[in-house]
């Protein structure tokens, strides 16, 4: 029989054993071990938790801010590293917003995102977007240092905007790193 498996599973608490309730509070303390097969709660920052949603929204916000600051300059297309930063910020913003919507759905229906396939997709996506965002931020930082410190041509360029966009891209990556690590840990601990 083929049956579909949803990406979100209900979180159900196991009822207390009837024998412990009948014996009194002393028996409850002694038999306080969790029954076999009960999982611990999702760690803060995992998909489907309020902290996970906060991390996703922070990722999207800082990526969108980096995109807006870089796009506000008229000469960013002349440097390939800055164009790469814009493309990476767009990808990061879209990925983070997509997963934020998944987190919102899971929170609204009070479900946990513990499906192995979903966690694997989240981990791979976070790893790819994180690598791209970090690479773009590092490349932009290198060009910004070259323009500002080595060539001393900040007078005719938007160095402050370039530095701000680069810093925002790094902050977006720092918000992505805990999500990626928690997803990888969750996937590896299965």
Curated annotation (Swiss-Prot):
Residues 1-50, 103-126, 186-190 are cytoplasmic. It comes from Zea mays. Its main location: membrane. Belongs to the Casparian strip membrane proteins (CASP) family. This is CASP-like protein 5A3. One of its GO terms (cellular component) is membrane. Residues 1-31 are annotated as: Disordered. Residues 72-81, 148-164 are extracellular. It is a multi-pass membrane protein. Residues 1-12, 20-31 have a biased composition (Low complexity).
